[in-house]
């Protein structure tokens, strides 16, 4: 059972503050990208395992840090008994991303550029295409994938930001075909402004934020019970 917290008990942050927090974590507080990616991916996998039965899962990964979270999530999902396949439509030249690909491929997790031809046999899709630095609209090769996912009707779990959404304002339009309309979301570090009106299942992971950073920005952080890495946010 995931501990539940009130939406009123945590801060919702915009794009600029989210970027500032990341910048300070990597500079002033000495964190490495791969550290936070591992924590984010693990928290995402834990939320998925808490909310969905073990199954095949297609993990959509973009070329940036959100995609890296997806690779880590897939690796942990396999450890939790799921059967992940990764869709990686645009490869990154970043050495960290190359390492994440190797980690998954050597763990027998398929990595391919296109959606599986048997997509309808997957009960769950994990959306890790775009993070909080995304600015709409989406472009190829992502638009066709987003449209296909939307048309599939398969349950989608988004990591941090549903792909195609404006970080401040949320989904551009309910009628838009090239954005993700998820069934559940995990916010990372803190929820972004676009999640304020979200009423579906909403998890939060980010039990690593230094106290000094919290105090500097006047942030309301969740209280994580025991040694848990995730909480569930409700009204």
UniProtKB/Swiss-Prot annotation:
Pfam families: YjeF_N
Annotated binding of K(+), by residue: 66, 127, 163
Catalysis performed (reactions): (6R)-NADHX = (6S)-NADHX; (6R)-NADPHX = (6S)-NADPHX
UniProt GO molecular function: metal ion binding; NAD(P)HX epimerase activity; nucleotide binding
Chain positions recorded as (6S)-NADPHX binding sites: 65-69, 131-137, 160
Listed cofactors: K(+)
GO cellular component: mitochondrion
Cofactor binding mode and count: Binds 1 potassium ion per subunit.
Entry's family note: Belongs to the NnrE/AIBP family.
Alphabetized HAMAP family for the sequence: NADHX_epimerase
Name of the protein in question: NAD(P)H-hydrate epimerase
């Amino acid at each position: 059972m995931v501990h539940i917290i009130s939406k009123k008990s945590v801060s919702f942050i915009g794009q600029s503050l989210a970027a500032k927090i990341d910048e300070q974590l990597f500079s002033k507080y000495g964190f490495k990208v791969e550290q936070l990616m591992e924590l984010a991916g693990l928290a995402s996998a834990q939320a998925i395992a808490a909310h969905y039965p073990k199954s095949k899962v297609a993990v959509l990964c973009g070329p940036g840090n959100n995609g890296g979270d997806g690779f880590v999530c897939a690796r942990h999902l396999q450890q939790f008994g799921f059967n992940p396949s990764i869709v990686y439509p645009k490869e990154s030249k970043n050495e960290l991303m190359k390492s994440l690909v190797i980690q998954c491929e050597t763990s027998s997790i398929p990595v391919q550029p296109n959606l599986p031809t048997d997509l309808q046999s997957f009960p769950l899709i994990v959306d890790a295409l775009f993070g909080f630095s995304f600015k709409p609209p989406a472009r190829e090769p992502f638009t066709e994938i987003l449209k296909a996912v939307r048309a599939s009707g398969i349950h989608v779990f988004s990591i941090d930001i549903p792909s195609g959404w404006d970080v401040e304002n949320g989904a551009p339009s309910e009628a838009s075909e090239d954005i993700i309309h998820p069934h559940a979301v995990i916010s990372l570090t803190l929820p972004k402004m676009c999640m304020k009106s979200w009423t579906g299942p909403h998890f939060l992971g980010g039990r690593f934020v230094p106290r000094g950073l919290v105090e500097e920005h006047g942030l309301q952080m969740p209280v994580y019970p025991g040694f848990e890495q995730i909480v569930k946010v409700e009204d």
